[in-house]
Amino acid sequence: RKVFQVKILSGAREKGRIAEIFNYCKKQGVAVTNVSQRELNSISPNHQGVALETSGYPYHTLYDILDNANKKGEAPFLLFLDALKDPQNLGTLLRTAEIVGVHGVFLPYRHTATITPAVVNASSGASEHMMVSQVNLSQSIDLLKEKGIWFIGLDISEEAESLSTINFNGPLALVVGSEAKGMRSLVRKSCDHLLRLPMRGKVESLNAAVAGSIVLYLAWQSRGFA
């Protein structure tokens, strides 16, 4: 993204990491403005003393993401998020996805958290390194299945399969549903496999971001941490 301006908390530019950011901006010719705590809070409650004014988030196409995997010579490893609402959950999953080498993340056009300052912050900047696409999920799933990609949806129903039966190798897409309702019916029916994580406690389910992160790591491990 193009950075237009950096806003730094007044009196903080001489301290640690913020001083490094200030000096880097000077070298790059980026405008730096001192602002009050109140102004930074109005931009993002968790600003850590600095905020950037940038161009809009550069969403990618489905084909951009497939090309990304192809250029790396790797089987596609994708993440579909079906109507996830919480910015913290989206940020957490973007962070995990970037760490384990997911080639792209897919969001629906509506009824979802999108890439906002809160999500960028929650992802610890991983959103800036991850290819994200907004699509019609059901249509995209059908298209990608025709290209040989298998879809595994996280589910808590009794009909869902156990971990031992799932093959995470090869072209793969993991689907994580919304916090309250899970996957929508059409998306759920489109999955090749439904996966239920084993649990031994009294709580019925895991947080969506936690469950998704666990399976992303398990898939990465199965793929040889490559």
Specify the residue positions occupied by each region the protein language model found.
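N-terminal positively charged helical leader segments and presequences
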Residues: 1-71
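Short, glycine/polar-rich helix-capping loops at beta-to-alpha or helix-loop-helix junctions
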Residues: 112-118, 181-190
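Structured adenosyl-cofactor binding patch, chiefly the S-adenosyl-L-methionine
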Residues: 99, 121-126, 185-226
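Short beta->alpha connector loops at strand-helix junctions that form conserved
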Residues: 36, 82, 108-109, 136, ...
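Histidine/lysine/aspartate-rich catalytic loop segments that bind and position anionic ligands
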Residues: 103-160
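Amphipathic alpha-helical repeat scaffolds
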Residues: 85-92, 207-211
